[in-house]
Amino acid sequence: MRIDGHTRLAAVVASPIKHSISPFIHNLAFEKTHVNGVYVAWEIPESDLAETVENIRRYNMFGINLSMPYKEKVIPFLDGLSPEAQLIGAVNTVVNRDGRLIGHNTDGFGFFASLKNFNPKDTHIMILGAGGAAKSIVTQAVLDGAKKVSIYVRPQSLVKAKENFRTLLDQTDCYLEFHDLTDADHFQKELRQTDLLVNATSVGMDGESLPISIDTRFPKELLVADIIYQPFETPFLALARKQEIEAVNGLGMLLYQAAGAFKLWTGENMPTGAIWQELENIYNS
């Protein structure tokens, strides 16, 4: 990687963020595409967010990525939002267009790009969880033409979940339903008619917990996905694979959301195949 007077900067902004794999992904992409850029991690307090965004203009940066807790808090400092970022109400990528800062959200795009043989159009999808990741995935599914999306949460979270998806409910005609995750009978019944089941919660990061009953039976044509990539195989994915069901972890989502941001910044396609091999060497060891 060369750094000279023409090198442009990109960064990921969050707190905490020093653990992030994003600098590894993007700097490898800059190197392999011969784009003169460098990517760093900025761990900042909220009081520095406005100035950090202004620095994108000041230093003619490509832009920034954002993670928690700034995906929503950054919006007032931007000049505009992409359609998906408007629907989600959160931004993970800011693009500098000649000094005009536009917020995008590539999380949903990244998720579906990681499912190589799955097209959301006219499908029935079940999502576990209603947080930021779930909202990004559901929004992208709606934009891509999903027929029905069912969102499963704990009973005490049902009211909040519906409110969290209010904008999407008001502005789209996709059939969205909200259900109690503890109702195992209803869950199993709907699962028989479902094309894709997604765990969009953090349950399973400990390598032990399951977000659903261990007695759940998966239909043979189902695709199962988890947004978690550490551990490489969660108990949720292990349950699916034990039943010989195709199962995908969250490492691809991490890579392809980065690829979406890289394309917006540089106009270049990230060499995802080569970078995927490097990531697998790190996480599947």
UniProtKB/Swiss-Prot annotation:
Binding site for shikimate: S20, I21, S22, S67, N92, D107, Y229
CDD domains: NAD_bind_Shikimate_DH (cd01065)
Domain of life: Bacteria
GO molecular function: NADP binding; shikimate 3-dehydrogenase (NADP+) activity
Subunit structure: Homodimer.
Top enzyme category: oxidoreductase
Keywords, in A-Z order: Amino-acid biosynthesis, Aromatic amino acid biosynthesis, NADP, Oxidoreductase
Pathway membership, UniProt: Metabolic intermediate biosynthesis; chorismate biosynthesis; chorismate from D-erythrose 4-phosphate and phosphoenolpyruvate: step 4/7
UniProt family annotation: Belongs to the shikimate dehydrogenase family.
HAMAP family: Shikimate_DH_AroE
Keyword Repeat applies: no
Positions in coiled-coil regions: none
GO BP field: amino acid biosynthetic process; aromatic amino acid family biosynthetic process; chorismate biosynthetic process; shikimate metabolic process
Catalytic activity: shikimate + NADP(+) = 3-dehydroshikimate + NADPH + H(+)
Binding site for NADP(+): G129, A130, G131, G132, A133, I227, G250
Protein's name in the database: Shikimate dehydrogenase (NADP(+))
Source organism: Streptococcus thermophilus (strain ATCC BAA-491 / LMD-9)
EC number, UniProt record: 1.1.1.25
Active site: K71 (proton acceptor)
UniProt function note: Involved in the biosynthesis of the chorismate, which leads to the biosynthesis of aromatic amino acids. Catalyzes the reversible NADPH linked reduction of 3-dehydroshikimate (DHSA) to yield shikimate (SA).
